[in-house]
Amino acid sequence: MANVGLQFQASAGDSDPQSRPLLLLGQLHHLHRVPWSHVRGKLQPRVTEELWQAALSTLNPNPTDSCPLYLNYATVAALPCRVSRHNSPSAAHFITRLVRTCLPPGAHRCIVMVCEQPEVFASACALARAFPLFTHRSGASRRLEKKTVTVEFFLVGQDNGPVEVSTLQCLANATDGVRLAARIVDTPCNEMNTDTFLEEINKVGKELGIIPTIIRDEELKTRGFGGIYGVGKAALHPPALAVLSHTPDGATQTIAWVGKGIVYDTGGLSIKGKTTMPGMKRDCGGAAAVLGAFRAAIKQGFKDNLHAVFCLAENSVGPNATRPDDIHLLYSGKTVEINNTDAEGRLVLADGVSYACKDLGADIILDMATLTGAQGIATGKYHAAVLTNSAEWEAACVKAGRKCGDLVHPLVYCPELHFSEFTSAVADMKNSVADRDNSPSSCAGLFIASHIGFDWPGVWVHLDIAAPVHAGERATGFGVALLLALFGRASEDPLLNLVSPLGCEVDVEEGDLGRDSKRRRLV
């Protein structure tokens, strides 16, 4: 899959499926609305209209189903007819699975995605997850032939006209962002260390005409970034705080996306075991998603100030490693007693959000991280967990997740009950909870929030993506689509405007909004 290029076209054109294999994909009632005249040129002379209709009649999705149309060259596949209220109407997760299992092999292939216009964005991002970019398989390295998958959307429903050119460009940039994030997360730390991650940031900056701000190694210590420095100081490749900033004329508010970029997490001196350490190359998933989303957002036009803050470190073991009982002074000015070196993500993010607040003057701060294993217990493998000081933004995250396919579900926000878990006798707080049975994912997020203050008047959103950042052994690029959708109102792109949760449409009780002091407008 690493040598596969995705091409989004308004019309994929006609071709014999034996020369260009084909997958037709959609919900069954949508597939029945596709006229034979539209697919005939992609199936003939191998498939007749009678065979096409017969194939549709055999489909019985539970939750999915597929039927070969011609040998191994053409297949039609059906998505679930209905989804529950906490799932995406696009059935995005099933799209990825069906593409992986049903798309015929070949150098040049075609996917016809049949859906309604509001599901185009989520469907495209789901398709992209089926084509990871990273591989080191020796056979793959010998196959230098570039493969292409052409994607055509056939729209049904009210807005059933052809897909516009601007939409195709948005889909290309969004899916490039998803695949970029997944590639970074899939790459092992012997290649994707902090130096390499900075190269990725510089590459995106050069493409966008932005020079990144980079603070690293001893300068972090000198300037007071005790969280990032303390976590990464034992590693061969030094830690860093990097920032990409987009500041257009006419901006009315400032947004900061803060990503956790732990390129590898051994656990530090509180070391992980042999079964829990493998896979910790994925601990940079938050920073990877922020990079992919920032690239796509700026390419599509972003009307407000947007800063991408990357907190990069390798949590390693060595003579200079942070010890339990050490006390670090963080950028917020607060002291933290370390009682668990494996609770390192919150330390680097605490510095990141403090920087966003103090130096960038952000009105809205969103941090994204593979923060806690408990997230998968709290909200499962498919739904990220959201913790925020705003009822409005909590509802917006859930709605944006359903629109883009990166699903989200709320955690309990109650600092007056939970923050006492971090009580320290010798510092302002400890970095790990006293009671792991007391909503640990919520508590971990509250640790981050405490470094901008629970009384901070702006909007703070924390997204824990520990479980959905991967599916099996592969990264998903989770978070890119979510950020683009959640902040779609600030985009100049019509498709991102469409998938954004509009402020007036977010389902929050009127009483909640009346009491909510964090009423920054939904962008």
From Swiss-Prot:
Requisite cofactors: Zn(2+); Mn(2+)
GO biological process entries: proteolysis
Tissue specificity statement from the Swiss-Prot or TrEMBL entry: Ubiquitously expressed.
Statement: the UniProt record of this protein carries the keyword Cytoplasm: no
Entry keyword annotation includes Protease: yes
InterPro entries: Leucine_aapep/pepB, NPEPL1_N, Peptidase_M17_C
Any GO CC annotation of this UniProt entry: cytoplasm
EC number: 3.4.11.-
Pfam families: Pdase_M17_N2 (PF18295), Peptidase_M17 (PF00883)
Key words of the record: Aminopeptidase, Hydrolase, Manganese, Metal-binding, Protease, Zinc
Annotated disulfide bonds: none
Residue sites binding Zn(2+) 1 per the record: D265, D342, E344
Superkingdom of source: Eukaryota
A GO molecular-function descriptor: metalloaminopeptidase activity
Active site: K272, R346
Binding site for Zn(2+) 2: K260, D265, D283, E344
EC supergroup of this enzyme: hydrolase
Function, as annotated: Probably catalyzes the removal of unsubstituted N-terminal amino acids from various peptides.
PANTHER family in UniProt: AMINOPEPTIDASE NPEPL1-RELATED (PTHR11963:SF4), LEUCINE AMINOPEPTIDASE-RELATED (PTHR11963)
Record-stated family: Belongs to the peptidase M17 family.
Protein's name in the database: Probable aminopeptidase NPEPL1
